[in-house]
Amino acid sequence: MATTFGSPSGDSRRGVASPRPKGREAKNTFCRNVTIYGHCRYENSKCRPPHLPDHVLNQNENAKKRFNVDSPSFTPLTTTPNGSVTASARNAAISPKAANAAVFTPKSQRSAVSTPNLHNKEPALDWHAPDFQEFVPETFGGPMVDSNASASYSGYDPYTSSANLASIAGQGHQSSAMNPYAQGHSGLEASYYQNPSAFQTSPAYHLYWPVGPQPTSLLGYQRTAHDFFIPDALREDLQKRAEVARQVMPNSTLPVIEQFHSLFCLDTTPQKNNAPFGYVSWIYKAISGKDGKTYALRRLENFRLTSEPAIRSAQAWKRIFNGSIVTIHEAFTTRAFGDSSLIIVTDYHPNSKSLADEHFKPMQRFNGRQATSSHVPEHVLWGYIVQIASALKAIHGSGLAARLISPSKTLLTAKNRIRLNACAIMDIVQFETARPVAEAQADDFVQLGRMILCIANNNTTAHLQMQKSMDHVTRNYTARLKECIQWLLNPQPPLGTPSSPTTPAPGSKDIDNFLGGISDQLASVFDSELHAQDTLTNTLGRELESSRIVRLLVKLNMVNERPELDASQQMSGGNTSNPSSVWAETGERYYLKLFRDYVFHQVDANGHPVTDLAHVLDCLNKLDAGTDEKIALISRDEQNVLIVSFREVKRGLEIAFQDLIRAGRGQGK
């Protein structure tokens, strides 16, 4: 049956009224009009589904607000006497709204609080930028190092950073901390605006490539490239000494003292120290204008000379020449520094350091913390004792006393090679209050024993805890060394008691008895020095004829490319003035040109230059010996090939060089 448009029917009523719920779980479904529009116009007439109560609607609206006056107040948990939380308190502390709380998002992972999107079908992969610690300018701090330890033993190391040298270039030796935030060339811009007076660091000679494994299948007459040069360790040491000796301070404000100029301060710390002379002392490196040699100048600030014989007491030290004493050359006073200063001129030993720097200086490689030092071998200690005893023999034999034997005033100039430094200073400073010579000589033995005891214990204050220090010596060294140290530390014994460290013969405590007691150690140290001398002699002998290579190079470069010599000879003989043809392709000296190209201008199969030191040394050695080995000399255009021997090349080179000498003599040169 057909119906007209708009006529009532049974299905038209179903589209106007609320949908009829179906199923048994539909009884708990509330009206959708309330959830969508907030109210239902058919609530009292036609709508069948149940509606939400008013207090529930108000609660949902209040939940959307940020501040709600109906929210429960904060109630802290209450604990029982035994410390446990009661069940009622635990239940009251958790709100029913906690189930609907949003997921916690840390603040560091989100830059801003964003509203969650309820209609996302796929989880969004948001990228959260990590938070960085905010930079807060603070005081520019230095390295974590003990200031007392670093100030006590801060020796001179020419191969470390030279930042501290600029602060000691002037007279005041004052240092100022760098401000990294200051505007100007003195701050962080110093790396781009270099100061022309900055100290130049030395080349890294110690970074040379070491000698690799040596082939063992060489014949008796075969050599490697390293056999033609001195050992790397000796070469590096000599190069470091030469580099240190040539160090200067550009734009230095240090004055010229007498004939000494180009002063360079060797103290790397600007802190003043009055010990042990009683005056603030500095040490400089200077060049003498008389002989051009380098000397060390020790300066004592604010020294007032009250007696002329005091300064003349250094004349006796100038007559002492001993290998274990730093030689003294001159002593005088000056006002070049703006005050009355005492200057002691001594020999300069480059790249040397004191025994305090060698054995007691904190290791800077472990963040400024002093690392556990290695055990000092006993033969090293005996070497120190023998060398100081040799110095005391020369000093006491001249009627003088060292008066100052300490690790900070004993120089280590080479491996296990020490020298007494700062001699004659105490004689000048304490001239009026000087002790008797015999008493001062006896005190030299005590100071020597203290120094050896401190080095053996690796502690500068070991002599203050005598029993503990001697126990350490007993555990780590032989009884012979312990007996020697005890003899040195004991005071002057009365007459008729044993005085030698090994022999019970009575006598006074002097240097002769001491040398007699350590005679066996004298022989051991002397034998070691002989072996070291033999090694240096063999190394020097290896370099004896190294100049013959230079002589060949000089001859080749003087003879080659000299056609004007032959032209002048022909002019004097009345022949044609054209250049001689001896250097032409058919000349008798043409092979000298080809030999030069054969030795120095080698190329590979692709025409690339080849720099082979072994080939150059091999050819020059064979040329110097004049062997009969034949070589093929090829011209640069590869059109001429000459087969000659090294003997023929050597003979032609000598003839050409003799002609050059005769031509020079003929012109009066």
From Swiss-Prot:
Segments of this protein annotated with the region Disordered: 1-25
Family indicated by similarity: Belongs to the protein kinase superfamily. PAN3 family.
Binding site for ATP: R298, D347, Y348, H349, P350, N351, S352, K353, S354, S408, K409
Name listed for the protein in its UniProt record: PAN2-PAN3 deadenylation complex subunit PAN3
Coiled-coil segments on the chain, per record: 520-558
Region entry Pseudokinase domain, spans: 247-519
Compartments, as annotated in UniProt: Cytoplasm
MF terms in GO: ATP binding; poly(A) binding; zinc ion binding
InterPro entries registered for this protein in UniProt: Kinase-like_dom_sf (IPR011009), PAN3 (IPR030844), Pan3_PK (IPR041332)
Assembly and interaction partners: Homodimer. Forms a heterotrimer with a catalytic subunit PAN2 to form the poly(A)-nuclease (PAN) deadenylation complex. Interacts (via PAM-2 motif) with poly(A)-binding protein PAB1 (via PABC domain), conferring substrate specificity of the enzyme complex.
GO cellular component, one term: PAN complex
UniProt KW Cell cycle keyword: no
Species for this entry: Phaeosphaeria nodorum (strain SN15 / ATCC MYA-4574 / FGSC 10173) (Glume blotch fungus)
Comp. bias intervals (Polar residues): 1-10
